[in-house]
Structure formats: C-alpha cells, structure tokens
C-alpha cells in the first residue's frame, strides 16, 4: 500500500498537482477547516474532530498569521473544494514545520510531503496526533526539532484540538511538544483548555511500580539481593546419604 501511495503521489507531482496547493492565513483558515468546503467528507479529512466547529475555535491560528498558516490542496474538479489540509508552523528557530496531514485519499499524504520538500519545509514524521518532535527534513533524513512556536499569550475565545504542539504555556506565550508545570493541554474538542489532572501539565508522572525511586523490590529475594538455596536451605552443605 505504501508503494502504491508513493507511486500515485509521484505521478500526481509530474501532472503538476502542486499548482493545486495554496497557503492561507487568518480568517481563511477557519473557512477551509469547515467540512462544507471539502470535496467529500471521507478519509481522515472528513473524520477530523475539528471539521464542523465554529471559526472561533481557530482563534489561536487566525490571530498568529506570522507563525501559523494552513496548506490546502484543492480539488482539480472543483477548486472551491479541498482534498486535504495541513497546518504549517514557523518554529522559534525559523524552521517551517508541516503538521499532521488530513486528506480524502491516503496517497495524497505523500503528495503533501513532496510539496513540503519542494518548499524546504520539515514534515511530521508520524502522521498522527502524537506530541513528537521527530520530522522529515527537506533532504529526507529524520531529525529531532526544537518544537516551540511563539504566539500571542492570550485573548482567545476558544481553543482547537492540537495534534502536535499541544502544550500551551500561557505566561510565556508558546506552544510546544513538551509539558511543563505552567502548561495547559489543548486536547479538547469543545474548545476548552485543561491542565492535566495526572501530571499537572509536566508531561510526566511518577512511576507507580517504583514510586519514583527508579528501582523495585525483587519478589524472589524480598529486596535482599540473594535468596536461600532451595536445595540446602542456605546452609551451603547437604546431607550425603550412602546408597
């Protein structure tokens, strides 16, 4: 299947499908996010949890046009509809990063990646909702990025569900892939933000097996580091019986 998708994307590229891509900012992000502008409501694009919400959910995107845009892939049959979309972030170190890709057709994910490569952008390695900092670089190698975006610190009406840069530090005005004690998690489909009840926003919790010590007591030796021999009861010798 991966080979077929790669083959289809290669053919599409030579057929000048790149001309159907467009980068939009501001209010246009909310416009193209809505499923009324999808060619069909299928694939990962049609099943996205943010495909049928009010535009105010996207305030954090719309209000930060210098660092956030949306790459859309228009339908060849109907340019007023799209076949895919992906957020494009400008990280604090200046790199451009393409986030999770949502498409009607699986093969178009590779087309998005090819388009990103053509523009010198980095692309999320695993096309999922994981808060990972691994990405494909423009030369195709896998790299770990400094995944931090500087945004306006507040004043948003609602908040979107974020796939990757889901930790919002309100005081510092950043989105990142790493939790912190001052961070809120943007993983709510109702437009709210939350501080994780389990980790307090740190992104990690104490191990329940070792209570944070890093070691656990051996159930065979009761933590002594040794146990009595079952053959000699720890005496070191056994009774010899003549046959």
Whereabouts are the PLM-identified features?
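Cys/His/Pro-rich metal-binding microdomains
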Residues: 181, 197, 208, 219, ...
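Non-catalytic substrate-recognition and accessory regions of acyl/acetyltransferase enzymes
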Residues: 1-99, 103-193, 200
């Amino acid at each position: 299947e991966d080979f077929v998708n790669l083959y289809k994307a290669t053919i599409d590229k030579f057929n000048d499908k790149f001309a159907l891509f467009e980068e939009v900012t501001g209010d246009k992000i909310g416009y193209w996010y809505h499923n009324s502008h999808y060619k069909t409501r299928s694939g990962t694009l049609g099943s996205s949890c943010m495909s049928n919400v009010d535009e105010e959910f996207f305030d954090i995107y719309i209000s930060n046009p210098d660092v956030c845009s949306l790459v859309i892939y228009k339908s060849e049959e109907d340019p007023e509809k799209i076949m895919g979309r992906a957020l494009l972030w400008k990280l604090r170190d200046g790199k451009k990063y393409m986030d999770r890709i949502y498409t009607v057709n699986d093969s178009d994910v590779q087309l998005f990646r090819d388009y990103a490569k053509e523009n010198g952008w980095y692309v999320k390695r695993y096309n999922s909702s994981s808060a990972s900092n691994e990405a494909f670089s423009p030369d195709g190698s896998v790299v770990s990025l400094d995944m931090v975006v500087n945004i306006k610190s507040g004043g948003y009406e609602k908040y979107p569900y974020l796939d990757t840069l889901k930790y919002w530090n309100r005081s510092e005005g950043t989105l990142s892939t790493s939790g912190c004690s001052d961070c809120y998690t943007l993983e709510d489909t109702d437009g709210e933000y939350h501080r994780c009840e389990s980790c307090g926003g740190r992104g990690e919790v104490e191990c329940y097996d070792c209570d944070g010590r890093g070691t656990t007591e051996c159930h065979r030796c009761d933590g002594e580091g040794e146990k009595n021999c079952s053959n000699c009861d720890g005496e070191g010798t056994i009774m010899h019986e003549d046959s």
